[in-house]
């Protein structure tokens, strides 16, 4: 009995457990259906996102190609700017070197001019040094003039004294004649003569004493040079009896004219002894020659002053030119340093730009790789989800029910743990799906931005196409004008030919024909060149149109693709980077 009771209890427990499992099973089925519906919705959204992502991928490839072209254009522009700056620097350096050489040549020329002026100045100094004897001669003439003035001051009082002596001599002769007329009284004659001679014995010496007192060194020099002691003593009448006895004898047989001549001769013998004689090597010149020499000396002095001023001006000009040259050299060196600094800055900027471009290219390549991997992963997940998806929900529910019935635990705590674990897994899957959906939304926004950029690039290409069309229209108009000009030239040529037939002279016609032929050849060459330019522009326009049409067709095919394989096939086609790709495809 005891054994039967536990067996019955076990059977009752087993009966209750399927009942509880049957109660839990409808709830889990509803949850699974809701999750499966959400999963289907997410899968549909994922498929749409994948299709849009594939479209964006194609657009990204096109934008990448355009970006590469833009980067290449920027690099070419930077290289052209660097080359132009280097050419400008070379031109500026060559011009600066030419200026420096010209300044050096000017400086050498100024130095040569200064040397020539210095040589001319030395020559003039030599001439002036040769003219120095004129200055000494002038000084000597002035000294002689002063000596003559002093001599004149000495001679004039002596002439007055001589006149007084002559007067006294005349009176003495008159007295002698009176005495001779009276020979009876010899004693009285002697007494009268003594009386006459003793009447004023000192006056002849008074002027000499006064002269010696007043004249000073000049009188002593005159007395020393003239040595007139004997002459003056000859006029002295108070020297004793011998003088008194010889006077009548010396004057007895002379007439007044002879006495005057003798006195003048004696005076002439006195004066030349006091005249100043120049030292040896010098000569006395007349006044007109002296004035001429003075004029020449003043003229030479003026020339010397003008040359000195010119030398000072040249030295000042040379100093200023040296300062200007130094300043210009400093300015040129500063400009060269600034140019070198600018070149280094530009080189650094270009290198930085190249580094940034390389980094951007690397980032774009990495992002492209990441995007490719992500697309592949999403494609694999999508394929896996599609492969795991059952044909209908009923067999899936039955299979799940059978699996759950088989995997249901036998105890209640285990069943509760299973429910909690299932709920956690469902929440984890939901969070993962939310994260995946958010990531897909971000990727969709990014791809839309790239699509907008591509649209802007397309708009810019259309603008360039319009500009090219306008240029083509201008070229067509110029071609039409050239054709009209060609027709006009042909008409003129035909007229010229007709006139040439009418003209008698052939030389003029040949010349005009040659000129018209040259003009025609020039116009033909010009027309051919314009036709070639027009054809080139038309070809470029056609290429732009074909490229834009091909891109539009490919984008439209990507948008209209129904499956991921079609999008991958469109993407795997050859990239449209050039018109040759369109021709090849």
Curated annotation (Swiss-Prot):
Superkingdom: Eukaryota
Residues covered by region (Disordered): 178-265, 381-408, 491-515
Organism annotation: Bos taurus
Gene3D superfamilies found in the cross-reference section: 1.20.5.340, Single helix bin
Gene Ontology molecular-function annotations: growth factor activity; GTPase activator activity
Family note: Belongs to the rabaptin family.
InterPro entries: Rabaptin, Rabaptin_coiled-coil, Rabaptin_Rab5-bd_dom
Function: Plays a role in membrane trafficking and in homotypic early endosome fusion. Participates in arteriogenesis by regulating vascular endothelial growth factor receptor 2/VEGFR2 cell surface expression and endosomal trafficking. By interacting with SDCCAG8, localizes to centrosomes and plays a critical role in ciliogenesis.
Residue numbers of Phosphoserine PTMs: 188, 192, 198, 202
PANTHER family, per database record: RAB GTPASE-BINDING EFFECTOR PROTEIN, RAB GTPASE-BINDING EFFECTOR PROTEIN 2
Name listed for the protein in its UniProt record: Rab GTPase-binding effector protein 2
GO cellular component, as recorded: centrosome; ciliary basal body; cytosol; early endosome; Golgi apparatus; intracellular membrane-bounded organelle
Claim: Acetylation is one of the keywords in the record: yes
Subunit structure: Heterodimer with RABGEF1. The dimer binds RAB5A that has been activated by GTP-binding. Interacts with SDCCAG8; this interaction is important for ciliogenesis regulation. Interacts with RAB4; this interaction may mediate VEGFR2 cell surface expression.
Alphabetized UniProt keyword annotations: Acetylation, Cell projection, Cilium biogenesis/degradation, Coiled coil, Cytoplasm, Cytoskeleton, Endocytosis, Endosome, Phosphoprotein, Protein transport, Transport
Biased amino acid composition, Basic and acidic residues: 491-501
Gene Ontology biological-process entries: cell projection organization; endocytosis; protein transport; regulation of cilium assembly
């Amino acid at each position: 009995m005891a054994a039967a009771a536990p067996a019955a209890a076990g059977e009752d427990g087993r009966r209750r457990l399927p009942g509880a499992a049957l109660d839990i099973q409808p709830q889990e089925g509803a949850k699974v259906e809701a999750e499966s519906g959400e999963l289907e919705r997410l899968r549909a959204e994922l498929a749409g996102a994948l299709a849009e992502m594939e479209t964006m991928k194609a657009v990204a490839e096109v934008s990448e190609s355009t970006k590469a072209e833009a980067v290449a254009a920027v690099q070419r522009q930077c290289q052209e700017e660097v080359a132009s700056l280097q050419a400008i620097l070379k031109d500026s350096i060559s011009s600066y070197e030419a200026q420096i050489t010209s300044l050096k040549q000017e400086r050498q020329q100024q130095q040569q001019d200064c040397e020539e002026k210095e040589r001319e100045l030395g020559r003039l100094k030599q001439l002036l040094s040769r003219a120095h004897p004129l200055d000494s001669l002038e000084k000597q003439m002035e000294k002689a003039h002063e000596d003559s003035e002093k001599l004149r001051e000495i001679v004039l009082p002596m002439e007055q004294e001589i006149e007084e002596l002559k007067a006294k001599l005349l009176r003495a002769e008159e007295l002698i004649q009176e005495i001779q007329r009276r020979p009876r009284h010899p004693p009285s004659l002697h007494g009268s003569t003594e009386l006459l001679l003793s009447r004023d014995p000192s006056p002849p010496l008074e002027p000499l004493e006064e002269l010696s007192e007043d004249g000073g060194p000049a009188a002593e020099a005159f007395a020393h040079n003239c040595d007139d002691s004997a002459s003056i003593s000859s006029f002295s009448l108070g020297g004793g009896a011998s003088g008194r006895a010889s006077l009548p004898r010396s004057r007895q047989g002379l007439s007044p004219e002879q006495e005057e001549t003798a006195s003048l001769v004696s005076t002439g013998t006195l004066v030349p002894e006091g005249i100043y004689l120049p030292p040896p090597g010098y000569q006395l010149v007349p006044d007109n020659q002296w004035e001429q020499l003075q004029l020449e000396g003043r003229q030479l002095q003026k020339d010397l002053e003008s040359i000195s001023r010119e030398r000072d001006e040249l030295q000042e000009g040379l100093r200023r030119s040296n300062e200007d040259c130094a300043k210009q050299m400093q300015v040129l060196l500063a400009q060269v340093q600034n140019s070198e600094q600018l070149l280094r800055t530009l080189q650094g900027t270009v290198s930085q730009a190249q580094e940034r471009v390389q980094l951007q290219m690397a980032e774009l390549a990495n992002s492209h790789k990441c995007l490719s991997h992500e697309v592949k992963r999403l494609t694999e997940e999508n394929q896996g989800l599609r492969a795991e998806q059952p044909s209908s929900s009923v067999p899936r529910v039955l299979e799940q029910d059978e699996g759950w019935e088989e995997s249901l635990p036998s105890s209640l705590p285990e069943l509760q743990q299973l429910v909690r674990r299932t709920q956690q897994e469902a929440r984890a899957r939901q969070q993962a799906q939310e994260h995946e959906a958010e990531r897909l939304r971000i990727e969709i926004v990014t791809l839309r931005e790239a699509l907008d950029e591509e649209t802007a690039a397309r708009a810019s290409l259309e603008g360039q196409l319009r500009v090219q069309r306008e240029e083509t229209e201008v070229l067509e108009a110029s071609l039409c004008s050239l054709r009209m000009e060609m027709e006009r030239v042909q008409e003129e040529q035909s007229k010229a030919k007709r006139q040439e037939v009418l003209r008698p002279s052939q030389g003029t016609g040949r010349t005009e024909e040659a000129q018209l032929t040259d003009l025609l050849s020039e116009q033909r060459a010009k027309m051919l060149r314009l036709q070639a330019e027009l054809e080139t522009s038309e070809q470029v326009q056609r290429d732009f149109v074909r490229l834009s049409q091909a891109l539009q067709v490919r984008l439209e095919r990507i948008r209209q693709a129904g499956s991921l394989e079609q999008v991958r096939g469109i993407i795997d086609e050859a990239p449209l980077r050039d018109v040759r790709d369109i021709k090849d495809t």
